[in-house]
C-alpha cells in the first residue's frame, strides 16, 4: 500500500511509519508530500485534515492504534512515550520521551526522510522490546 505524510519527519511520523510496517502493512511504501498534494490512491497520515492524524488530545500514533484496533499493551505504552515526545503536554509520565525526542530531532537534522524512517525502525524495535520486558518484569530491565 502507498502511504504519504509530510516531509521533515519527527517522532510521531517516524513512530507511525514503524507501526505501519510492523503491524498494519508489511509491504508499505512511503512518500513525503505537501498537505495539498495527497494522491487519491494513497493513505495519508499525520497531516492536517486526514483521519490518521492528531485528533483531540491524541497524537497520530495514538489515533492509528485506535483506528486499527491494536490492543497490544506494549504499543499503548509506546504511545504514551511518543505522545510526550511529540506534544510534551505532561499528559503522561514518560521518562523516555525526552531522549526519544532528542534522537529523532538529531536524525531529522542529519538524514533524508526515507533514511530516517529506516533508522528509526531500529530505534522503535529496541524501545518496544525494552518496554515489553519492563511490563513482563514489572520493573525496568537491566
Please place each PLM-identified region on the residue numbering.
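Conserved, aromatic- and glycine-enriched, well-ordered alpha/beta core segments
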Residues: 2-6, 13-69, 73
